[in-house]
Amino acid sequence: MSEKRKSNKIIGIDLGTTNSCVSVMEGGQPKVIASSEGTRTTPSIVAFKGGETLVGIPAKRQAVTNPEKTLASTKRFIGRKFSEVESEIKTVPYKVAPNSKGDAVFDVEQKLYTPEEIGAQILMKMKETAEAYLGETVTEAVITVPAYFNDSQRASTKDAGRIAGLDVKRIIPEPTAAALAYGIDKEGDKKIAVFDLGGGTFDISILEIGDGVFEVLSTNGDTHLGGDDFDGVIINWMLDEFKKQEGIDLSKDNMALQRLKDAAEKAKIELSGVSSTEINQPFITIDANGPKHLALTLTRAQFEHLASSLIERTKQPCAQALKDAKLSASDIDDVLLVGGMSRMPAVQAVVKEIFGKEPNKGVNPDEVVAIGAAIQGGVLGGEVKDVLLLDVIPLSLGIETLGGVMTPLVERNTTIPTQKKQIFSTAADNQPAVTIVVLQGERPMAKDNKEIGRFDLTDIPPAPRGHPQIEVTFDIDANGILHVSAKDAASGREQKIRIEASSGLKEDEIQQMIRDAELHKEEDKQRKEASDVKNEADGMIFRAEKAVKDYHDKIPAELVKEIEEHIEKVRQAIKEDASTTAIKAASDELSTRMQKIGEAMQAQSASAAASSAANAQGGPNINSEDLKKHSFSTRPPAGGSASSTDNIEDADVEIVDKPE
């Protein structure tokens, strides 16, 4: 098979906590691409089963029976230390552990997987979905992240893209992507708010759009708030109710918890459209008295009460975003709802309360982010003209200075890309080196902010304290990823650092993961080929057995026996798990024998036709052997040609019975 040619398309991927989506520009319009399963979004789930890696719907289907090896909502762990994810760990059935660097990783049967590797598996699925649609190899992408993702989380997402074999041309915030999708065909100036409550995170962004310019004025959010937390309150309610009814605690039963997770998600979705829902989980557990069943009714009012504190948590970030944008709620022309949780009526009511107007429901909350990413891909690829995106950083960036103080160099909501410089000096006489501790956050003391990197500037010439001139430069690229340098003016010595993900993935680790991903891709391809060959062989057995049954009396007995022998050979090859080549060879042999059925049937049809013709002319009813005796032939003369009409001999015809 010839290799696919490389595509010049830059695809847009919404790498979501719960679901992911891929889109591409086609004929100047963004198009969401359906997966091989026919769905426009793919569950962001990766599972390991029987030596095989499952992604998306196949992974979700087996989650109940394989909870410890089914990794869902892994986006909540990307770019974060183990010490930062205590609340998230409580909500998942799989094992989260710290690696040697203190990063949050997943322990599946003593093998550690980083969140970047799992994210890469989902991105590969999105890449393959786009390739199947385009018929070309895709190498470039725009990937979205929550607006409130910090520098480490953004860098980790970009690393996941690299592991998946993608050149990530841009990382853009999800609300910004949604605004692009909404405003690409709008005329006039507008100020809009994008309220994005997804599976794992909450973002609010205020933008000004007009004449193709999309300027983010401010952004805020909560990376610990999302649909998973809403599922969690329903799960806890079910656990409490079941314990009251049966006296059994299901919280330590991972298989039961996975069933409750699925039931909670289903109930949550249903309650956006109905006032109450039935939750039935038969045989949820068993005790000495026999099997136990869970049967509960949850009303929308109950659910809203259970989730009230979560909904309340969306208010403060919205107020802060408006304040940072120097706007009031009445200045906002439109409010976009993004993310599956924005469908919840109580959430929509709070949005109306905050902004004083009905939110816009004209965009698909599940697809709008991927569409915006595809538009940005079109901008970068030159397919979309006259669009300028001005984004901002969500959190202030600075360094630790004397007394453990956080000194910001770049304030939050500064438009990017940007570069900021500031002169610092030493705190002691003849200080030979300084340690630059890079921080992200809004607190005045360094220890209360997130340390995202550190490096040393050494060999500073001896000088009294306060004399050395050390220029620190913060350079933030369009992806919101930070590069820091420090230079001593006297010696000219300079030290630079690209702030890497808190996961601490080094270049050699990323390259190894890329190689591993390619290896698994080849293994998965071989497994699929083997599965396809087995399925085809099974189909061949079925067709052969049906043909023998249907035509048993109409084909020679020796052919029936021959086919049955080859059916058994194929069945044995499948049973013994023979090589793909061996199964295919046995299947091909059976296929060849199957063709003989057709030949035998054709001969029989010809015989029947000849008999009918003879009968029509008043001739006798003769069998095929007799037909051979009654056949006639034409023979060209020696040296002549059968097509030569000048030398045609009379046919030799042997007449057995003269018709009356």
Curated annotation (Swiss-Prot):
Disordered: region residues: 599-660
Sorted UniProt keywords: ATP-binding, Chaperone, Nucleotide-binding, Phosphoprotein, Stress response
InterPro entries: ATPase_NBD, Chaperone_DnaK, Heat_shock_70_CS, HSP70_C_sf, HSP70_peptide-bd_sf, Hsp_70_fam
Induction pattern: By stress conditions e.g. heat shock.
Function: Acts as a chaperone.
HAMAP family the UniProt entry points to: DnaK
Name assigned to this protein: Chaperone protein DnaK
Native source organism of the sequence: Chlamydia trachomatis serovar L2 (strain ATCC VR-902B / DSM 19102 / 434/Bu)
